[in-house]
Amino acid sequence: MSMAPEHDFFFKILLIGDSGVGKSCLLLRFADDSWTDTHISTIGVDFKIKTLNLDGKTIKLQIWDTAGQERFRTITSSYYRGAQGIILVYDCTDQDSFTNVKQWMGEIDRYACENVNKLLVGNKTDLVNEKVVDSNQAKSFAESYGIPFIETSAKNATNVEECFISMARDIKNRLADIQETPKPDEVDIKSKNKTKSGGKKSFC
């Protein structure tokens, strides 16, 4: 007998954005519920696994922490492929990191799947007195691209879990819509040739 799959969905999610915006800290907070004041400069790419129970489904997230430095762009570009979700992070206290979001959107358009889910995240909201990026400005920017926006603090865990859960839910809903609306010429084929994926689903 074959064993039941450990999860219903498997999603690859990328964290991208300038160096120092807190991508690694967001990942550590979500995956391990930990925090470090030490600056983490990611060398290349690292990832963590986190399993969620969402809307009655078990979802396994593979979250990749990609370096933001320019010299790593050529290394990380290949990792855009196959990602179902991309979380674009900027630092609320660093105007340049927000200005560069537009360039990162260009990277996504160039390397990622056309229908990949995206989420704009303004991190470090705990530094209230140092905040320079206006929330409404960031929200308007996100709306112009048709993507959700949320502000977080990895240090005090504000909205961190919500950030990843909302991304997972958006991906799941998008894939559910795709599965439930097959093209007319695919219906007969699918009824005759059922997939042998063992219940696991991984889509771009």
From Swiss-Prot:
Question: Where does it reside?
Answer: Cell membrane
Instruction: Name a single GO biological process.
Output: intracellular protein transport
Instruction: Give the GO cellular component terms, alphabetically.
Output: endomembrane system; lipid droplet; pathogen-containing vacuole; phagocytic vesicle; plasma membrane
Where composition is biased (Basic and acidic residues), the residues are 182-191
Binding of GTP occurs at 17-25, 35-42, 65-69, 123-126, 153-155
Recorded hits in Pfam families, A to Z, give: Ras
Provide the alphabetized UniProt keywords: Cell membrane, GTP-binding, Lipoprotein, Membrane, Nucleotide-binding, Prenylation
Q: How does it sit in the membrane?
A: Lipid-anchor
Instruction: List where the motif Effector region lies.
Output: 39-47
Cysteines paired by S-S bonds: none
- Which residues, per the entry, are lipid-modified as S-geranylgeranyl cysteine? 204
Instruction: Mention one GO molecular function.
Output: GTP binding
Q: Which PANTHER family match?
A: RAS-RELATED PROTEIN RAB (PTHR47977)
UniProt-recorded name of the protein: Ras-related protein Rab-1D
- Source organism: Dictyostelium discoideum
